[in-house]
Amino acid sequence: MTPQVDSISSDSELPDTTEVVVIGGGIIGVATALTLAERGIAVVLCEKGIIAGEQSCRNWGWVRQQGRDHRELPLMVESTRLWEAMDTRVGCATGFVQCGVLYLEKTERDIAARETWLEHARPFGVDSCLISGTQANALLPGSTEHWAGALYTRSDGRAEPAIAAPAMARAAQAKGAIVLENTAVRGIETTAGAISTVVTEKGSIKCSSVVLAGGMWSGLFCKSIDLTLPQLGVISSVLRTRPMPNGPELSASGAGFSFRKRLDGGYSIAESRGPTIAEIVPNSFRFGKIFLPLAWLARAHLRPRLSRRFLDEWQQSRRWSLDGISPFEATRILNPAPLSGVLDRVRKSLADTFPFFKQLEVAESWAGLIDATPDAIPVISGVDTLPGLFLATGFSGHGFGIGPAAGQLAADLVTGNTPLVDPAPFRFSRFSDGTPIRPVVAP
C-alpha cells in the first residue's frame, strides 16, 4: 500500500532551458529545489512518479539528532534549526513539533553504548543526555518495564512525511521553481565533457547542472552513465493507527518497537532493533566486499532474503536508449508489501510494554525500500569526472529529518556558496580514493 500523500499541482510545460535540473521529488530533491528557487536560481524538478511517493512518505517521521553518526551531526543540527522555521518558510503546517525523543534501555550494557555515543556528540552542542529509569518513566508513564535508563534529546521532534515534502515543493513553485510529476529523466547529455542537457520522457532541457536525488534509483542512474555508486536496500514496514486520544507526545523507541504521534492524533509504529530484511539482489554480489563492515555491524539484526526482486533486477536494463522507455518509467513508485509478521510482532511488543496501545486500531500499513551506502551516511557531492553533476543520495534511513539541511548543502555546492557544513565526509570520491569505509551507525 502507498500511504496517502498530499498532492501538488504539477507544472505541465517542460522548459527548453534552465540552470539546474533536480532529479527526484523526495524530501532531499524538494529541499534542494526550494533552496535554489529562494536564491533566484532557475530550477526544474523532475519526478518520475509523485512528490514524496516513495521513502519520503513511508518513513517514521522522526526529526532527530539523537543516535546519529557523528559525521552527520553538524548537518543535522542545522536541519533542526531549519525545521523550526519550516512552517513559516513554506506557509503551512508540516507537522513539525519539538516533542523530544527517547531511547529506552533495559540493561546497563545498553546504557554504556549510549554513553559512548554521547561522548562523540557533546562537541556538537546537542542537548542529548542520559536519564535514569525513574526519570524515563516520569517522562513516558504507563510502561510495564523498569528501565535501566534512557537517552533523551529534548530538542528532537517529529514532522509529517506525507505533508512536509509536498509543502516544500509547493513553496518552491511559489518561488519560481518548475515541478514536474510523472516526468522520468532518462539520462543526460554532455558537451565538452560537462553536463549540458537532461533528457526526459517528455523532451529535453538544456542546463548547466544536475542534482541526482533519486533515492533507491540513484545507483541505477549512475550505472547508466558509467559511475559506480555502491548502494543496497533494506525493507522497513510501518503501520498507522486511528486517532488515540491522551497518548504519549514523545517519540520513543525500545527493543522491539518505536512510535511517533501523528498530526491526526494517531501513531506511526514500527519495529526498532528487530530483524532488518535485506533483499538479495545482483548488486549484493557486486558490492558485497565494500558492504561487509556494515553487514558485520548490523549482524545481530540483518536478515538476508531471496525474493522475486532478484530476478526483476537481473532482468532490468542497465543501459537504454534515451529515446526509448527507461526503467524509471516502467516502475513509477517502488511499493513493497509490508511484512505482516513484523507488524504483528511490533504490536505485541508495544502492547506488552505500554498497555495504552493494546486497543490500537490499524488504519493502514505500508513498507518502504531504504537505500543504504556502505558507511550508512549520504553522498552530497559533486562528481569530479563529470562537471555539473551533483549527487544527494544514500541517506540510509536517516534522510527525512536531515532533508532540509541536506538540500541546502546540495544547493550550496551547485551554486558555489560557502557550504552550510564541511561537505568532506559526504564526498562521492570516498568510495574510490582509498578512504577506509567505516560505518558507525547501521541503518
Regions found by a protein language model. Name each.
Residues 2, 85, 106-181, 186-194, ...:
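Flavin (FAD/FMN) cofactor-binding and adjacent substrate-gating region
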Residues 3-18, 31, 39, 130, ...:
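C-terminal lid/capping helical subdomain adjacent to the catalytic/cofactor pocket in oxidative enzymes
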Residues 13-28, 44:
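Beta1/beta-strand and adjacent pyrophosphate-binding region of the FAD-binding site
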Residues 31, 188-315, 329-337, 345-353, ...:
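Flavin-dependent oxidoreductases
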Residues 37-57:
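Glycine-rich FAD pyrophosphate-binding loop
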Residues 60-62, 156-158, 277, 369-371, ...:
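Glycine-rich phosphate/pyrophosphate-binding beta-alpha loops
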Residues 134-138, 304-315, 320-398, 428-432:
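Flavin (FAD/FMN) cofactor-binding core of flavoprotein oxidoreductases
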